[in-house]
Amino acid sequence: MATPAQLGLQNATSPIMEELIAFHDHALMIIFLISSLVLYIISLMLTTKLTHTSTMNAQEIEMIWTILPAIILIMIALPSLRILYMTDEFNKPYLTLKAIGHQWYWSYEYSDYEDLAFDSYITPTYFLEPGEFRLLEVDNRTTLPMEADIRMLITSQDVLHSWAVPSLGVKTDAIPGRLNQAMLASMRPGLFYGQCSEICGSNHSFMPIVLEFIYFQDFEVWASYLYIVSL
């Protein structure tokens, strides 16, 4: 999760987020080099009085400033297209989780388990336990198995929402009447926080998302327990 005075992105816990951070650093370095070159040229123009008033054209320079930007754009586009392909790749997901946005809470349905569904509301401040985070805790955490491909189906019951968990590299719009899908996976156990990222009304800021990734055997025990309780 984000921390005060944090510089940079959140720590990655999924392969997609690791690729996004690497691409961010790659693109940022290219932008830094271009900006440095432009500032250097501007400083030269401001500090020298030498001009070439007799120069009418310069074919070599024109070729350089046409070909070089094209090469730079290709260097940025190829990694970006690779990541776009990875985000849309769905290979035999272990389970399917459906997230439904409401004003102002989330509902979750485990499609592979019978009658396994619940609502997830924000925990009021006066109910928080020591060590919990204000505006980020929920009454029912979404529990998932780690090291497993999970397909998310995301929609909305009323207005536009957006289901986002930064450390997993997932941000998908929840649109009424439409199912959007995303793939997520965590390489380690733990709690991961997110929020609705689409302004959806007066309580938009009170729609947190909490994912708890646990080991496979613990997840099966958890799912069995919820099924027994719901009987």
From Swiss-Prot:
One of its GO terms (biological process) is ATP synthesis coupled electron transport. It is a multi-pass membrane protein. Its EC number is 7.1.1.9. It catalyses: 4 Fe(II)-[cytochrome c] + O2 + 8 H(+)(in) = 4 Fe(III)-[cytochrome c] + 2 H2O + 4 H(+)(out). Residues 1-14, 88-231 are mitochondrial intermembrane. It holds the Pfam family COX2. Its cofactor is Cu cation. GO terms for molecular function: copper ion binding; cytochrome-c oxidase activity. Keywords: Copper, Electron transport, Magnesium, Membrane, Metal-binding, Mitochondrion, Mitochondrion inner membrane, Respiratory chain, Translocase, Transmembrane, Transmembrane helix, Transport. Belongs to the cytochrome c oxidase subunit 2 family. PANTHER family: CYTOCHROME C OXIDASE SUBUNIT 2 (PTHR22888:SF9), CYTOCHROME C OXIDASE, SUBUNIT II (PTHR22888). This is Cytochrome c oxidase subunit 2. It comes from Aotus nigriceps.
